């Protein structure tokens, strides 16, 4: 793997200092810390503050650490959707988010274009949508949604929560947090 650079979601080449950071963490006992200790609380606060600073996340937004995008998709559907979500599908990952809504007994509305294509700006107006699910950069195809496309939903769906999957695009784009409710990566 040495010298190999992958421009795919994974595996990714690890930065050369990671090994030393891991050894240091084990020497300091960090992997064995209880999540109830002051030390862990300090590490969590530093990580949260760092993520907020890096991404420009407003102070009234919360940061949660989860294990995977699948967990985020499941939790967002379980906790934010009583009945109906609106999904924009243009590849494998946006499709999976929609499938999870169906598996959890919800009634997702799917706006789908062929894999690898973007969406036109004529967005259908569905009533009683509780969540609009968008994938900023569809990892399976590399198609990226323009910010103007994402930002229009706050006006079109003022009562819906706007969820943006930014797994393969952060930290580079700058999101307008007044236009979205949840951003995950």
Report the location of each language-model feature.
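N-terminal "arm"/small-domain region of PLP-dependent enzymes with the aminotransferase-like
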Residues: 1-34
